[in-house]
């Protein structure tokens, strides 16, 4: 799957969204989250592909860092007012919604907030119960929310879901024709190429979804269990080998 931060385009102007994409230190967030379990990975470049899948390309912008983020804001007319940037009397201040009581989520969110402060963007952390995620998402009451999605065997379908304006409350209409072209293309490899182009442009031009981590997949099993465990895309419904050879060590 993929863990991400989602920026609400109804509440956060495009230049600020672009600055957040450029300024977030995803590698440090990963380190905070996974260091205790000894997991290391390269920051993901996609919401739709795992790095091991056919067609994967790193779609994340290459010009990143605090200085890049500040320049994006200043080029858009934002000026520092104390610790934070502002424009037309409105401070770059937004609510970062987290869900549940996971300590790692709290720690990484605080780091994210602290890092944005260095850039000049204020993030106020709002914690809600896991049960409120759907309500908050439907009402679009968040500025930024932490979320996560499963990655499927078909990145094309995922790209069509994430990167159409219909799902993003009308934002990114200029890319709808590219999404439609992708779905109308018969050759699957060409579809994958268009999907990566669509994702790259959406990250650069619309800036809503920030892929942060893929993470590990652990399963707890009784000692002695053989031929069973994390299995990526394989499911017993479609692949009998998932369960037919499961058993106990002799």
What is each residue range found by the language model?
Residues 5, 124, 180-184:
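Short, well-ordered beta-strand elements within core beta-sheets of diverse protein domains
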Residues 21-61, 68, 104-113, 135-250:
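Detector for C-terminal structural segments
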């Amino acid at each position: 799957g993929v863990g991400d931060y989602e920026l609400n385009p109804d509440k956060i102007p495009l230049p600020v969204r672009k600055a957040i994409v450029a300024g977030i230190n995803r590698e440090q967030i990963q380190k905070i989250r996974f260091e205790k379990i000894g997991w290391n990975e390269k920051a993901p470049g996609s919401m739709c592909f795992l790095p091991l899948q056919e067609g994967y390309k790193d779609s994340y912008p290459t010009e990143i860092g605090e200085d890049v983020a500040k320049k994006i804001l200043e080029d858009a007319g934002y000026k520092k007012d104390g610790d934070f940037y502002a424009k037309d009397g409105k401070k770059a201040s937004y609510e970062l919604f987290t869900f549940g009581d996971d300590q790692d989520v709290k720690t990484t969110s605080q780091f994210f907030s602290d890092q944005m402060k260095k850039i000049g963007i204020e993030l106020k952390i709002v914690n809600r119960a896991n049960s409120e995620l759907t309500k908050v998402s439907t009402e679009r009451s968040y500025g930024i929310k932490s979320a996560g999605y499963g990655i499927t065997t078909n990145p094309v379908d995922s790209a069509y879901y994430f990167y159409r304006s219909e799902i993003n409350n009308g934002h990114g209409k200029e890319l709808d024709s590219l999404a439609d072209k992708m779905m109308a293309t018969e050759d699957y490899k060409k579809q994958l190429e268009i999907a990566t182009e669509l994702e790259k442009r959406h990250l650069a031009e619309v800036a809503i979804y920030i892929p942060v981590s893929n993470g590990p997949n652990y399963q707890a099993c009784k000692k002695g269990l053989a031929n069973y465990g994390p299995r990526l895309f394989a499911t017993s419904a479609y692949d009998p080998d998932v369960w037919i050879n499961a058993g106990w060590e002799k």
